[in-house]
């Protein structure tokens, strides 16, 4: 993967993370249970982050082990292949806590 493609993929992760941040900022945890559109949008952004992570070279991910790539990709796989088993509490925790942290870490990598 070229440096350009790597940077593009990282910027895509930031874009999806920013979308989740905008969604979560306007809502509360309970909204995942009552607002199907919000839940589906949140799920999709998490899936897209995981999909982008799979495109990053494995050796590059290994050299940036401060980011839990395996967990990110596993979450994507669970959402794609068994989305009905993802509990709203887990999705909220990922969207409200894990994704903003990931976004900050990716932005630092892009600055280097």
Where are these regions (language model features)?
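Solvent-exposed interaction patches of small proteins and small membrane subunits
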Residues: 1-112
